[in-house]
Regions:
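Basic nucleic-acid-binding interfaces
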Residues: 2-4, 8-23, 29-109
Length: 109
């Protein structure tokens, strides 16, 4: 588990809040920026398809993620879209050839 992921889990445990599933899609023409955006998103969710992530985020995590992404985006060239899914919509997601979106839970013993 990366340090960023550990920090996100520690933060989540501390705030003990509700999360929302976000489907995050990005279109970044520059290879270096695209790689950086991909690395940032890997610390917050699951890479499901090329340029597409599923992330279960609290409000604070969403703000943190957007802030980190904004540091690397060129507004006139890059696009990142956040699609929130309600709990009922997550349950109704249909997949072919892959697992449905589920929140990874961390249990500390």
């Amino acid at each position: 588990m990366s340090n960023r992921t550990k920090a996100a889990w520690k933060h989540r445990r501390q705030e003990n809040s509700q999360t929302t599933c976000y489907v995050i899609a990005y279109d970044i023409p520059d290879d270096r920026r695209r790689t950086k955006i991909h690395q940032i998103l890997m610390g917050f969710g699951k890479w499901t398809q090329y340029s597409l992530f599923e992330c279960f985020l609290s409000r604070k995590e969403l703000v943190l993620l957007r802030s980190k992404l904004a540091e690397h985006l060129v507004e006139q060239q890059d696009s990142v879209r956040f699609y929130p899914l309600c709990a009922n919509c997550v349950k109704r997601v249909e997949t072919v050839g892959g697992p449905p979106p589920v929140e990874d839970l961390l249990f500390v013993v």
